[in-house]
Amino acid sequence: MNNKGFNNPLPYIFIVFILSYFSYEIYSKNIILASFYVVSFFIFIMYFKGKYIMFILVLFFVAALNNTICFYNYTPKEVEEVRITEVKNYYGKGEVNGRIVSLSNINENIEVGNKILVKGKFTENKNISNGVIGDYKIEDYKVLKSDFIDKLYKRRKYVFESIESKLGERKAALITSVSFGYKGELNEDHKELMKNLGISHVISISGLHLVLVYSVLRRLLGVKLSLILALVYVLFSGASAPAVRAYIMIVILTFGKIVKRNYNPLASLSLAGIILLLIKPYYIYNIGYVLSFLATLGIILFNKDLNKKLYKLPNSIRNTIAISLSAQILTLPIIILYFNEVSLNFIVGNIVVIPFINVLVVLGNILIFIVEISSVFNYIMYVCHYIIKYIDIFNVFLYNIVNFEGVK
């Protein structure tokens, strides 16, 4: 039995969780392939790590698989509470105990964030990769009293509309998308702008956003209150997989300091991944989840060495380039496969544009609290207007000197 390298078991357990979730979908299509896939993995583990470790990992595999089966085989009752997550015409999506259901016969007055009591007919229609367990044909419904989550969503919409009234839809969408993930109004031009600059990750709330917000809060308010407010921010931003991942890692880091334990970023990343997959197994197919974990893993594995190799550069530039490159090493292949194109300007974009995006993130989040104070609000709008103007000018400049068609 070879226990060497098993002092940090969480990465192995995380891999086993990933294996179990992929196996579940493959099993539904090809039993033989799924069986071969799983057996081969555990033979590999037994050969290199021994029977004892293989047995432990098999137990975790069974637990993860059982969790997945329970998740997808849940049958909603005839009357259920549903949290609305998407509305489009008379159709939409909602969450029932963490599972996603497709909804039909939705009234146009229902908004994202509403919690409704639904009476209807449920039909099983699984879409494993999207977390959908079936379709709900609404026969009758009642909008329940607005709760904390619903109030957060209403606040997001109100802040967006306030910014829109001053700067227009385009700039408002950019500010709210980079600040707290409200990107429903973000048009293709802005998405293309971020792609051209190689910084399209900023239009989704990620670890970058949360760490920035938490760092500012911690300096102003201390650790305990900052953790609470950071959690509210995660909920306010829609609780995306990257944001939740970052929050879990921040909590682990903070707790480790309290109990005076060394922080292991790889174990922390793995634990965050396990927790997220336990709650929502379909995250394994979520591109935001995948890119977030691969980017963080790349930083953990390569950032230190890249920093050393770039020692001749000034600290701020060296750190930015090292983080950008290390994050791209593992994510670039996925981006090319998933989006079928990639901008090679991510280094320039991260050095020149990201600092201004970070200012937008901070200002956008300040707006959440002061949007009703017209004098302060108008001043922030003035600053945001010129920041976006600078980003636009820089994008045009790059466009004129570099081929932005990407890698096809």
Regions found by a protein language model. Give the residues of each.
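N-terminal leader/targeting segments
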Residues: M1-N73, V396, N400
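Membrane-interface micro-motifs in multi-pass membrane enzymes
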Residues: N8-L10, I26-I32, L197-H209, F236-M249, ...
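Internal transmembrane alpha-helical bundles of multi-pass membrane proteins
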Residues: F14-F17, P242-K408
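Structural detector for short beta-strands of small beta-barrel domains
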Residues: N73-Y90
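OB-fold/S1-family single-stranded nucleic acid-binding modules
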Residues: V96, N127-I149
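Beta-strand/loop nucleic-acid-binding surfaces
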Residues: N97-V112
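Flexible glycine-rich surface loops and low-complexity tracts that mediate binding to linear polymers
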Residues: V112-G134
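Aromatic-rich juxtamembrane segments at the membrane interface
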Residues: E139-M249, T254-F255
